[in-house]
């Protein structure tokens, strides 16, 4: 059983979403994220880091699109520029948090601490990915019959990686695995059987990222 799906890039970086991403992906607390972002801003590497706006300037959008076209391929560029707008009452004196130059990749960032490079990498990838197309894949639910036993597997087959080529955001759910192409009635070779004991877990405690989201 399979069906096609698309996964979209999430909205551009605002202060709250940057704090959430830095907490979940880098283990940074809110105050640490803002301290590191302040250093990047003062060094002229990123735009102002206190903003409610997901919007981007036309020049920055063109900058990202030129980078994608020159360094990746035409297929990784959306047909039209993606424009992001904020909520009606959002404070949009500043645009979304982004690098000041798309061509300044994390690998080229010099004279900065490890934590600054890590946060910059997060911001840069989010910025570039926002002008890339959706990821496309087949969602697969497979049942494998072995004698009197039926084994189930849930996963996906990637058709086109899209924005996930540069950003792992929303690339795969925790219970999904990349599966090879399968056909109904196909004979498979048993390689290994593992018996694993698993337990359900209580809801996780609130992290700083979860509190910011709330």
Label the model's feature ranges.
Residues 12-22, 47-51, 202-214:
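Short acidic, hydrophobic short linear motifs in intrinsically disordered regions
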Residues 23, 41-42:
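Alpha-helix C-terminal capping/helix-coil junction sites
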Residues 28-39:
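Short amphipathic alpha-helical interaction segments
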Residues 43-121, 152-195:
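Extended, highly charged linker/hinge segments and catalytic-adjacent loops that couple domains
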Residues 118-125, 139:
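TRNA-recognition modules of translation machinery and tRNA-sensing kinases, especially anticodon-binding
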Residues 137-155:
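Long, charged, helix-prone linker segments
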């Amino acid at each position: 059983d399979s069906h096609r799906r698309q996964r979209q890039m999430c909205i551009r970086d605002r202060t709250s979403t940057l704090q959430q991403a830095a907490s979940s992906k880098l283990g940074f607390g809110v105050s640490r994220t803002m301290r590191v972002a302040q250093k990047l801003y003062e060094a002229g590497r990123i735009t102002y880091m206190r903003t409610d706006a997901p919007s981007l300037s036309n020049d920055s959008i063109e900058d990202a699109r030129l980078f994608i076209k020159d360094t990746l391929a035409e297929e990784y560029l959306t047909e039209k520029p993606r424009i992001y707008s904020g909520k009606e009452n959002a404070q949009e004196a500043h645009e979304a948090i982004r690098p000041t130059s798309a061509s300044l990749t994390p690998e080229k960032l010099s004279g900065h601490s490890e934590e600054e490079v890590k946060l910059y990498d997060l911001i840069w990838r989010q910025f570039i990915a926002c002008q890339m197309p959706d990821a496309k894949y087949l969602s697969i639910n497979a049942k494998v019959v072995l004698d009197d036993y039926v084994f189930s597997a849930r996963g996906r087959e990637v058709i086109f990686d899209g924005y996930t080529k540069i950003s792992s955001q929303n690339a795969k759910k925790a219970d999904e695995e990349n599966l090879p192409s399968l056909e109904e009635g196909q004979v498979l070779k048993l390689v290994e059987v593992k018996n694993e004991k698993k337990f359900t877990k209580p809801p996780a405690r609130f992290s700083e990222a979860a509190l910011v989201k709330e």
